[in-house]
Amino acid sequence: MRQYELTHAIYTPSSIDAGIAAFGHLCQATAERLVDESVLTITGGDEALDPELLNYILALAAQEILR
């Protein structure tokens, strides 16, 4: 079991919500909204926390920035 905590101002609420919606069946994920950033905590088995999940959230965040 591993846990990742991703904290960065570029993670907008919509990108985090989209990532949780897409991969929530693979792991437990919670998001905490702060004033200028969001904290995403992902907990699950090693197979659930693969780079695909983290890259997906990064890609969504990048799309948010480009809009």
Predicted segments — roles?
Residues 5-14:
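Short, surface-exposed ligand-recognition loops at beta-strand->loop->(often short) alpha-helix junctions
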Residues 16-19:
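Hydrophobic side chains in well-ordered alpha-helices
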Residues 22-28:
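Short amphipathic beta-strand starts and helix->beta connectors
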Residues 29, 34-36, 41-67:
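Helix-rich interaction surfaces within compact, conserved domain-sized segments
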